[in-house]
Amino acid sequence: MKIMMMIKLCFFSMSLICIAPADAQTEGVVFGYKGKNGPNQWGHLNPHFTTCAVGKLQSPIDIQRRQIFYNHKLNSIHREYYFTNATLVNHVCNVAMFFGEGAGDVIIENKNYTLLQMHWHTPSEHHLHGVQYAAELHMVHQAKDGSFAVVASLFKIGTEEPFLSQMKEKLVKLKEERLKGNHTAQVEVGRIDTRHIERKTRKYYRYIGSLTTPPCSENVSWTILGKVRSMSKEQVELLRSPLDTSFKNNSRPCQPLNGRRVEMFHDHERVDKKETGNKKKKPN
């Protein structure tokens, strides 16, 4: 039961990105997405959450053209994903999928991060050029030093997303468990090929930020894929269906950039000047 042991360890050691105990709380403090426990109040709910209010490297952000810098030293994302066991989990404030040992790794700036889980937010947390999308997928990886790397994909309403189509029956079962009163249900998925989740990209954005839920720790390397993917409206509702009403819209508002640098990778040396705020000088 390695997958179940890993889930327990994750619940114990990581209150990140809504990996929280069963009642959507950390350190015994309930947090939410509106009202007295909403994002604007997170920093005042518990001393351990103070960074949510005073941190200067908070996430998510709105990635604006004028703030983007093309970095020719960045490399394409190197990800190695494999077959592994998986479990779908209702985390009260989001739907997540935990992976067993050996799920894969991502290498960012010569640092290795191991794939732990993925989860969805509806609507998207990050905005791209002022646009908020229908959903956002977070692939969560952790390094040996405890820091995190999250690879995020934005989704617009359109054609069905193939991986979610495969998970339809499991998501329906997760919803049925909630209706029975089990608000922290777990549904065994079995062995899956995590390579089916990976998507190649010719462009991405990178910046240093934080967890998007309490305690909002500022130890996350964010990679936002430049290509916006599609999922159907029905799939968006399917992701929301296992959650209580107060968590169906589970996106934290965008946070100030505070002078941070948002870098862009593009596999072409020539970058459209409309995409970036730093224009290259013409040669003499």
Swiss-Prot record:
Strongly expressed in aerial tissues including leaves, stems, flowers and siliques. Changing N182A: Loss of N-glycosylation and impaired trafficking from endoplasmic reticulum (ER) to chloroplast. N-glycosylation is required for activity and chloroplast targeting, probably by facilitating folding and endoplasmic reticulum (ER) export. Disulfide bridge between Cys-52 and Cys-216 is required for correct folding. It comes from the Eukaryota. Disulfide bonds join C52-C216. GO terms for cellular component: chloroplast stroma; endoplasmic reticulum. Residues 260-278 have a biased composition (Basic and acidic residues). Glycans are attached at N85, N112, N182, N219, N249. Changing N112A: Loss of N-glycosylation and impaired trafficking from endoplasmic reticulum (ER) to chloroplast. It catalyses: hydrogencarbonate + H(+) = CO2 + H2O. GO terms for molecular function: carbonate dehydratase activity; zinc ion binding. Residues 1-24 form the signal peptide. Zn(2+) binds at H119, H121, H138. Its main location: plastid. Keywords: Chloroplast, Disulfide bond, Endoplasmic reticulum, Glycoprotein, Lyase, Metal-binding, Plastid, Signal, Zinc. Changing N219A: Loss of N-glycosylation and impaired trafficking from endoplasmic reticulum (ER) to chloroplast. This is Alpha carbonic anhydrase 1, chloroplastic. It comes from Arabidopsis thaliana (Mouse-ear cress). The lineage of its organism: Eukaryota, Viridiplantae, Streptophyta, Embryophyta, Tracheophyta.
